[in-house]
Amino acid sequence: MRKQANSHLDYPRAPCKTGSIRMRIAVIGTSGVGKSTLARRLAASTQAAYIELDAINWQAEWKPLATDDPAEFYRRVQAAVDGPSWVCDGNYPGVRDIVLARATHVVWLDYARPVIMWRVIRRSFWRAITKAELWPGTGNTEAFSAWLDKGHPIRWAWDTFAQRRAQYAHLLEAPILAAAQKYRVTHPRDLAAVESALAQQHNGASA
């Protein structure tokens, strides 16, 4: 598998099968809901590039490209979504339109707040314990000392939950997604069926 340093693109091991459908899937949802985990699985099952907007944004020492150089952030995202087949996850209003304009499918992970909070706390705890580098080449890790920061994923997920839910409900009705297939997943137990349906579409099979 070919990768780039601080890679926001993960390329498939092999070209798509003859007869398979080229898909561009946008995975949306609030912080900590599990977008990246799902997006990686979908990229593998549909043989598509994986685009992680957080990996494009966060530079070394937690410097945000989307804030420091919005034009460059936009350019990099545009270059990524110009590809023929991808799965993209992330919440960045400044590039939302260029992602959604190319999306053939949208998956909204709309779980209940307790589910999301459990997931984001568990994830942050594990990251802080292991000191795992979040994106290769950045040196960025999570620390317990940052848990009370306003921008930390735990606080961010809690503070923005209601606002994000309303935004996404409105977004799915937007004209830019009129031709896209949309999936709203309200419980983790329903996710397998959505993944199966998308994999079948990729393979050109009937659901």
Mark where each language-model region is.
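NTP-dependent small-molecule kinase module
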Residues: 20, 45, 155-207
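Hydrophobic anchor at the beta1->P-loop junction of P-loop NTPases
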Residues: 27
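The conserved Walker
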Residues: 31
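Conserved lysine of the Walker
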Residues: 35
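Hydrophobic positions on the alpha1 helix immediately C-terminal to the Walker A/P-loop
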Residues: 38
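Post-Walker A helix-loop "phosphate-sensing" segment adjacent to the P-loop in P-loop NTPases
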Residues: 44-53
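Conserved nucleotide-sensing/catalytic segment adjacent to the nucleotide-binding pocket
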Residues: 53-55, 60-106
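A glycine- and Lys/Arg-enriched "phosphate-lid" helix/loop adjacent to the NTP-binding pocket
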Residues: 111-164
